[in-house]
Design a protein with these regions (language model features):
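C-terminal substrate-binding subdomain of Rossmann-fold SDR/epimerase-dehydratase oxidoreductases
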Residues: 31, 35-166
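Short, charge-rich amphipathic segments
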Residues: 1-3, 29, 88
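Active-site Tyr-X1-5-Lys
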Residues: 1-12, 37-38
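Flexible, glycine-rich beta-alpha linker
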Residues: 9-29, 52
Length: 166
């Protein structure tokens, strides 16, 4: 923004909510927990697990950036969110259910891996973004539901286990 204003260069700014999808760093929640479920390792949940996050499938994020780049108003800021808030615990339970189905495990077996751990100091209870502006002004909304995106993501990680390890 400052560079654009200083030098008179056209610009738009985007801010986003939590992304998930293929090729995400293995230490992030979704790929970490996919790997831990495969290996039947604990699923560490901070505090009470009621922290809320807005989740956005990475392909929807890329489409939104493309739209803002081509259709956004010069100098404007657009928040890109999933309109999709989940508590960490609920997200983990959905992930466990899908993983049990995909791995042919007994329903509920992965949920037994959930382990509550001491919370981080200053941990934010909610990370979410108001994406109303991009929706109203540019007509953008996510095209992939959370469950669909999670299923695609799980399939990718299960098919690319070597990548996850390296």
């Amino acid at each position: 923004r400052a560079y654009g204003e200083t030098y008179g260069i056209p610009y738009v700014v985007t801010n986003c909510s939590n992304n998930y999808g293929q090729n995400q760093f293995p230490e992030k929640l979704v790929p970490l927990f996919i790997n831990n479920i495969v290996e039947e390792k604990p699923l560490p949940v901070y505090g009470d697990g009621q922290y809320t996050r807005d989740w956005l499938y990475v392909v929807d994020h890329a489409r939104a950036i493309d739209l803002v780049y081509h259709e956004g108003e010069n100098g404007e800021t657009y928040n890109i969110g999933g309109f999709n808030e989940w508590t960490n615990l609920d997200l983990i339970k959905v992930l466990c259910t899908q993983m049990d189905e995909k791995l042919g495990r007994e329903k509920g077996s992965s949920e037994k891996l959930i382990t509550y751990v001491k919370d981080r100091p200053g941990h934010d209870r909610r990370y979410a973004i108001d994406a109303t502006k991009i929706n109203k002004e540019l007509g953008w909304a996510p095209s992939v539901t959370f469950e669909e995106g999670l299923s695609i993501t799980i399939d990718w990680y299960l098919s690319n286990a070597k990548w996850l390890k390296n």
